[in-house]
Curated annotation (Swiss-Prot):
Primary role: This is one of the proteins that bind and probably mediate the attachment of the 5S RNA into the large ribosomal subunit, where it forms part of the central protuberance. In the 70S ribosome it contacts protein S13 of the 30S subunit (bridge B1b), connecting the 2 subunits; this bridge is implicated in subunit movement. Contacts the P site tRNA; the 5S rRNA and some of its associated proteins might help stabilize positioning of ribosome-bound tRNAs.
Gene Ontology terms: biological process: translation
Assembly information from the UniProt record: Part of the 50S ribosomal subunit; part of the 5S rRNA/L5/L18/L25 subcomplex. Contacts the 5S rRNA and the P site tRNA. Forms a bridge to the 30S subunit in the 70S ribosome.
Key words, A-Z: Ribonucleoprotein, Ribosomal protein, RNA-binding, rRNA-binding, tRNA-binding
Xref: Pfam families: Ribosomal_L5, Ribosomal_L5_C
Family as reported in the entry's similarity comment: Belongs to the universal ribosomal protein uL5 family.
Keyword rRNA-binding belongs to the record: yes
GO annotations of cellular component type: ribonucleoprotein complex; ribosome
Name of protein: Large ribosomal subunit protein uL5
Any GO MF annotation of the entry: structural constituent of ribosome
Length: 179
């Protein structure tokens, strides 16, 4: 069992029951999945760029990402319907908790000029979205072997009904929010 998963079961659940007054432990919000998405616009000109992005994402997530394809043609961007333009991976279970652990304890503190993550990334349904500007904050990526700095979106989907509950859950997981 992952370290954060055990921490969730042993301490976070009881803390949130006290804080929000849930009648059952099954009402306590939990993280269902984490989705990593990397849009690679340069893949239109060079297919090698997408292969490198997929390799980076695989090292970061620990599982093989799926390539995302363009849904419709856009002449201005020289994209045709069905072109591979990015990659994404969905993490659940123990892998999700391991990634969350690495994100909070190792990767986020390595961001340049880091003062905490924004509290404005909640969507109203208790999910949190954040962006990472460069993939080198993860220790799995070797600085010498990258061809370009690429960012990614990280979506954390929870069972929380409100943003306040979701924020309390993420704060319990030691997320470094600003202020």
């Amino acid at each position: 069992m992952a370290r954060l998963q055990q921490f969730y079961k042993e301490t976070i659940v009881s803390d949130l029951v006290k804080q929000f007054g849930y009648k059952s432990v099954m009402e306590v919000p939990r993280i269902t999945k984490i989705t990593l998405n990397m849009g690679v616009g340069e893949a239109v000109a060079d297919k090698k760029v997408l292969e490198n992005a997929v390799g980076d994402m695989q090292k970061i997530a620990g599982q093989k990402p799926v390539t995302t394809k363009a849904r419709k043609s856009i002449a201005g961007f020289k994209i045709r319907d069905g072109y591979p333009i990015g990659c994404m991976v969905t993490l659940r279970g123990p892998r999700m908790f391991e990634f969350l652990d690495r994100l909070v304890t190792i990767a986020l503190p390595r961001v340049r000029d880091f003062r905490g993550i924004s509290g404005k990334g909640f969507d109203g349904q208790g999910n949190y979205n954040m962006g990472v500007k460069e993939q080198i904050i993860f220790p799995e990526i070797e600085y010498d072997k990258i061809d370009a700095l690429r960012g990614m979106n990280i979506s954390i989907t929870t069972t929380a009904k409100t943003d306040a509950e979701a924020k309390a859950l993420l704060v319990a997981f030691k997320f470094p929010f600003k202020n």
